[in-house]
Amino acid sequence: QAYEDSIRTPSLSFIEAMGTPLRSELSPHFVAVSKKIGGSLMRVYRDTRFAKDKTPYKTNVGIQFRHELGKDVHAPGFYLHIEPGNCFFGTGIWRPESAYLHKIREFIVDNPRSWSGILSQKNFSSDWRLIGATLIRPPRGFDPDHKLIVDLKRKDFIAHRNFSDSEIYRTDFVDFAINNYKQCSDYMSYLCMALEVEY
């Protein structure tokens, strides 16, 4: 009951409140689904099948506003992570299938100036950084000396921005979230173009 009252219910209320501004201020193609199971709120249970740590529950709240064509966490999305000492916003795509990953890499090769321009935008470069897994060697079929090889080696295309725990209690947290995601609008639009889905 404590989980229901202090975590799930307020999380679902936040998701519901995000629906209209998400569509009107960011993109009509990303969805906020306020459901206990199968919606934007990620499950509290950990997958312990291959983990040494068998603790059954996560210590964070994860919320993903994914693209309408996406079925799971591997779809492009706007993400919110709430955990004591580690609260952050995320934007992009996590562990895309190999075919989608190849599309993104090819798009960067074909449109390098746009990619570099987005990453150097002041409101993006000052507050956000790209995180995630990368290959040790250059991906097959791509020039190892390409000027953007660091980005071409990425396995995740996630932009990440931390914020303090106290921000969670802001009365305007919905606006705070939307304004942060807006800083990544061009970044998300670029990834959607690479994947040939609407933004």
Task: Briefly describe each language-model feature range.
Residues F78-H81, Q121-S125:
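Short, highly charged low-complexity linear segments
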Residues L41, N60, D156:
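A residue-level signal for beta-strand positions that form part of recognition/binding surfaces
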Residues P28-Y57, S126-R140:
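A short, surface-exposed loop/turn module that caps and links secondary-structure elements
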Residues Q1, P10-R23, I108, R113, ...:
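Long, solvent-exposed, polar/charged low-complexity segments
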Residues Q1-V44:
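Active-site acidic/histidine clusters and adjacent loop/turn architecture
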Residues A2, H29, G90, K103-I104, ...:
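Short, hydrophobic/aromatic alpha-helical segments in well-folded domains
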Residues Y45-V109:
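Aromatic- and glycine-enriched beta-alpha-beta binding-site module
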